[in-house]
Amino acid sequence: MDMQDFYTGHAFDAYEFFGAHTYFGGTHFAVWAPSAQHIAVETEIGTFDLHRTQSAVWECDAPGVQAGMVYQYWVRGANGRSVAHCDPYGTAMTLRPDGHSIVSDAPKGFADDKWMQERTKCFDKPLNIYEVHMGSWRQKEDGSWYTYAELADLLPAYCKKNGFTHIELMPLAEHPFDGSWGYQTTGFFAPTSRYGTPDELVEFVNACHKQGIGVILDFVPVHFAVDAYGLKEFDGTPLYEYPAAAVGQSEWGSCNFMHSRGEIRCFIQSCADYWLRVFHADGLRMDAVSRLIYWQGDPNRGVNGSTLEFLKGMNAGLQQRHPTAILIAEDSTSFPKVTAPVEYGGLGFDYKWDLGWMNDTLDYFKKTSDERRENLGKLTFSMMYAWNEHYILPFSHDENVHGKATIVQKMYGEYEGKFPQARALYLYMAIHPGKMLDFMGNEFAQLREFDESREQDWMVLKYPNHDDFHRYRRALNEAYLANEAFWSREYDPEAFRWLDCAHPELDACAIWRDGHDGAVLAAFNFGDTELADYTLTLPRAGKLTKLLDTDWQCFGGRTEKPKRLVGKACGGELKLTLAPFSGQLFKLV
């Protein structure tokens, strides 16, 4: 690493220099702490003083210190106090509540060359993401966590069977508080030891790639945990954070990174590069991007110019270094060109969560049938801006916590009546332009909100409503994967049209999606009464195949699945009978 690139914020490989690096017979330690008065590294075999270089870097060789040994820095800061800190660039840590770093060699064992060579950003491919919290997807009988290696035998196969293309893992970087779900970090380069070692994480990623499942990691570039052994006041001064409390503290009580400083930019973007390069992650979903666009995420306070420049520089560098990795923004603002390349004035992301679509859609499905007739615009409005960005439609963990209720519980009505509405909702999600993301448990209509301390309620699958819903979601995902009209022209406005959205009094609408080899269309009745003789005028005639009816008995509905689904010639008109709260999916070739 060129130190000038470190100070100016241009380096992406700071982890190659900083941190603990073993050599034959010992370990080299290096840490940046410009205002420190003295630093020593305490190891299992003794304490070693670091010496300060002219570049404000402290370093030393520690003979006899080997991989697997625990260490921490004692930093006497500018205020004269000595505080124990974990290594900012440490690549492994001990389990909370302990906060020591562990000397760790680079993980080995990847066997995914073919996957890495052939992966794409999926612009014209299916992208159906399963969001997972590793500690609570499944747990052992005694309530303990599965390890990365143990999950390698379970999670990729489950995703493959259920029609998901990628797993998105809530933050794996080491964090002290389970209830933060990983979003308040102390060890940015260290996979959490809750689930095992870095080598075991490699085993998990290998298993995913072997099954054809991509791995996207949540990445937190905005803020960090306030725990004293972490980054806060690392050298006795606000080094990684803003000195002013007005902008230095986030709404979550954590410390905001000072992105205007080159060394901090280098730290964050090197961390992003580390997860992509060392662990073969297929993408990063960047958390709380609105806080990087506007001061404290508030448009009324104006654009934060320095963080915008950081974001552009980081994304441009990551795109160059990892051209097939997927960069996703969790951004609730209307700031333009989030998914445009930096060279064209954009922020350089590949995708952006469509949180407007999510809010409007769920608000619509919370309403009674009568109220829906007056609010069809909540479903149609998203198409007014659908082509402005590359969107992902998210039903994330945020919509399953804090009293918001799970997706199925958000549906209007009582228990039995929620399931047909949820089936129609997910068909609407699939036919709407945009890639898809769904949080664990939604696929079998979990009723209980997310709790990081408990595994998902798999026992509900013994009840017919949940088992049928799970079967339906698998069939819908299979239809999505098998029919390229869902995704091959995802961001082409000419490939979409409303077949009907002009009769809100019917609680009905219909959508047409063109592909390269045919089309798919879906018709919906979001009302509580049967809709007979619902007639649609099609853009062209062809051979019609019914792919799916959300009201089929095999999915928990009342309609018997016909024995013959294919080969029906269709002119320019289609006449349907739609059950209450249902949708029907067709393919036309």
Language model features: what each stretch is:
Residues 31, 73, 132, 169, ...:
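Conserved, mostly hydrophobic/aromatic
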Residues 32-38, 539-542:
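Short proline/glycine-enriched turn/loop motifs at strand-loop junctions of beta-rich domains
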Residues 97, 280-282, 297-455, 481, ...:
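Conserved alpha/beta catalytic core and glycan-binding cleft of carbohydrate-active enzymes
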Residues 465-486:
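Catalytic cores of secreted or luminal carbohydrate-active enzymes
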